[in-house]
Amino acid sequence: MAGKFECYKDKAGEYRFRLKAGNGETILSSEGYSSKSGCDNGIASVRKNCVNPDRFEKKKTEAGKFRFNLKASNGQVIGTSQNYSSDSGCDNGMKSVAKSAPDATVVEES
């Protein structure tokens, strides 16, 4: 099953997207955008940048968990992962984004 981007409006009225892997697990979430076109541009940026391993930035949280950000060429964060309990789990999450995002469908949620 292919991955998908879910584009939705949050309670604050901002547009956001989340990338779900083929198994339904959310693997990347965006920050809020003021417009639908901004959200669409964010999705396009994920597709463009996820194929470059240098665009992923892995971090260890104070609680000892691992997470990553996907960044655009200008250094701006495009999306953030969930927390992973292991370094290898985080690496697998990055690989899953790189594999899922380029061909993921976009679903509009209301």
Model-derived features with residue positions:
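Glycine-rich beta-strand-turn "strand-cap" elements at beta-sheet edges
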Residues: 98-110
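Alpha-helical recognition helix of canonical C2H2 zinc-finger domains
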Residues: 39, 90
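A structural feature that tracks compact, well-ordered secondary-structure segments
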Residues: 4-8, 14-22, 27-33, 42-49, ...
